[in-house]
Amino acid sequence: MHLETGKADQAFREEVADFLGQHLSQELRQAGRRTMGICSPHEASQAWQKILYAKGWAAPSWPVEHGGTGWTPMQRHIFATECHLADAPMLAPMGLEMVAPAIMGHGNEAQKSFYLPRILSAEDSWCQGYSEPGSGSDLASLQCRADKDGDDY
């Protein structure tokens, strides 16, 4: 796929590449190259998120009112591409991409003002665990059944 970009997008690409060149240490690049799963090792991911946070780039997909960048879809694509090409560590997605959107959509103002800045700045790290009666965290062993009770189940 070939994406046409204009002068503004090319200038943005250069800004991102310059930033990455100045702020990605060899250690962070090595961590980025070693990434095998959905995110880089915690220490590298957190360190990189703090650098991006200081620049205002930690959450490109977030709304501006919550600390997002306000970038266009093309700018987000350019940023992701340049980060990949530079071997930047992958950020842990749980807080930024799963918990924060749930808080934005369903949290009250006190929850938003407390949790969102802490997620954005990498002050807090989030994880998700599952546990079900009789199965614990072994979700593959879950069993479901429906018992007819009158007109419903």
Which functions belong to the PLM regions below?
Residues 27-51:
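Short secondary-structure junction/hinge motifs that connect adjacent elements
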